[in-house]
Amino acid sequence: VLPFQIDRNRVGELFRKWLKGRWMAPGELKHLYQQEKLQGIYLPYWTFDAKADARYTAQGGRRRTVTRKGPDGKTVQETVVDWYPTSGSIRHFFDDVLIPASKSLKRNLLDRVGSFGLTQVASYSPEYFSGYNAEVYTVDLDDAHSDARQYMDFNLEEMARQDVLRRYDEVRGVSVLSLI
């Protein structure tokens, strides 16, 4: 359980300040606040840790400037890229990859909330839930694992790109084979 970091009174205060700056805010929103209907909810998440070993192949490009004569006879400088095959390996430990276990809120909204400081995680205690709603997971473990794997694969590909860019000016055709 990750306990709420802001108490209800502070949430109400922050929401009131935020609402004051929104003169076009819907009346229903203002009404909810006035009726003290703001409600905290505990949302379920899956968390994954994984040790990844990956090998990649790619093409690294080196830029160079060449001087040519244009159709009008004037000299023109152009930048060209020479491409070279390259490969490498990546080792990375993914710690606490959080995957929402709820379908009740859109993923992009949950992503905007940001990450959580999981150092604050506490053992389950019913007191944490007193006065709050809590949702049961609606994303099963296999689907969450698939999402976590996609996230890790995307990040491994980005790490491979960055590794190539340490030696080259450009990168293309990255292919990663990972063992997670």
Please describe what each predicted stretch is:
Residues L2-I180:
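Charged, low-complexity helical/coil segments in non-catalytic cytosolic or luminal regions
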